[in-house]
């Protein structure tokens, strides 16, 4: 939508079509707060109706094939469509398919996928919330795969918000929380020391440099052979671009781009990639996705001879939820930032958890949604 809005603002003489799997958009940054019931779906879901009113053509369907040599995209119609297979021709193709959660490399994943919960989709987060609000005792395992993955702080946010819920219910002493991380430290690294200190105070066990390679009915196994029992498994699978990207020769794990500022594919001037699926040397989060979309739109405007440009640079301030040590359902957050306009990138942080940062994150997300979709 950021690309579409920018192209319309630039008054480009073209039909702008958005192909989306769902007739609604589910915002990501505050999804973890669904666990504590501080957030509700109605505040973070938006439809495309106002975009259509502005002149964007919205096609609800799932893209499954790209033919870059002949400028064709094939898709199967979705919820608000005939449900048939369709084909779109393009002059420019901007790929923003997001990521797929690929557990295919984990033994037992297909058999025990029903045990895998996380905060990344409505069904799984709802079931995870149900379990942590009803269970009386047990072991909760939280897992983060190798970076990069979507929303770097989400696994630590998950662990700390679960901790808050259990404290609120008065049953924290009956649970063990274990965070297994495939990286050498929790993500993002800029606040890893802060998270480690909070984990220590809250009694959350942290295991780093351990990839989960096998899932059983009540146990996970790491690459080194360590076994961890679980009653609840809050696990994020490894992230990658959808398979049709590789099949089209546009990349393997991620979509190939020329540079962060020039998001065209190395082989095709008319194919650009933005968001989490783009092969960028940055964290995968909503702000970087938005900024990459503006760079891509600017490149199309440049190629079309338009003088309009959206103001953009790769830099952001973010907030990571760290729960509430007193068990109140009023989550605190720590603030961090990364400025990629300097090399090496300049990090910043305030290690002191504050309620105001949680409110700032909410205000930012609501403003983002209003600007993107045209209504609050």
Specify the residue positions occupied by each region the protein language model found:
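Residues that mark the start of a beta-strand
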Residues: 15, 139-141, 176, 270
């Amino acid at each position: 939508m950021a690309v579409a809005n920018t192209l319309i603002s630039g008054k480009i003489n073209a039909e702008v079509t958005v192909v989306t799997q769902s007739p609604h958009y589910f915002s990501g940054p505050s999804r973890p707060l669904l666990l504590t019931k501080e957030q509700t779906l109605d505040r973070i879901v938006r439809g495309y109706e106002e975009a259509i009113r502005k002149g964007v053509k919205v096609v609800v369907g799932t893209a499954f094939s790209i033919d870059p040599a002949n400028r064709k995209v094939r898709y199967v119609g979705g919820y608000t469509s005939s449900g048939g297979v369709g084909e779109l021709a393009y002059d420019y193709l901007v790929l923003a398919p997001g990521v797929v959660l690929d557990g295919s490399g984990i033994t037992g994943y297909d058999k025990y996928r029903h045990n895998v919960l996380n905060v990344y989709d409505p069904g799984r987060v709802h079931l995870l919330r149900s379990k942590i609000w009803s269970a009386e005792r047990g072991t909760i395992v939280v897992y983060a795969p190798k970076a990069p993955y979507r929303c770097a702080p989400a696994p630590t946010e998950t662990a700390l918000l679960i901790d808050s819920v259990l404290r609120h219910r008065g049953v924290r002493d009956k649970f063990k929380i274990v965070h297994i991380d495939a990286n050498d430290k929790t993500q993002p690294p800029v606040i890893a020391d802060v998270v480690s200190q909070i984990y220590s105070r809250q009694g959350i066990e942290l295991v780093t440099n351990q990839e989960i390679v096998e899932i059983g009915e009540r146990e996970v196994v790491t690459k080194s052979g360590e076994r961890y029992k679980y009653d609840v498994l809050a696990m994020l699978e490894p992230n990658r671009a959808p398979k049709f990207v590789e099949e089209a020769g546009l990349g393997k794990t991620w979509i190939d781009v020329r540079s962060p500022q020039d998001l065209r594919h190395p082989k095709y001037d008319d194919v650009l990639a933005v968001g989490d699926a783009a092969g960028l040397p940055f964290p995968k989060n909503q702000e970087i996705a938005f900024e990459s979309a503006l760079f891509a739109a600017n490149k199309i405007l440049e190629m079309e001879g338009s003088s309009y440009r959206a103001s953009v640079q790769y830099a952001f301030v973010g907030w990571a939820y760290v729960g509430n040590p007193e068990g109140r359902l009023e989550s605190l957050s720590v603030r961090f930032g990364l400025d990629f306009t300097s090399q090496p990138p300049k990090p910043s942080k305030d290690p002191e958890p504050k309620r105001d940062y949680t409110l700032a994150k909410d205000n930012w997300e609501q403003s983002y949604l209003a600007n993107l979709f045209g209504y609050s």
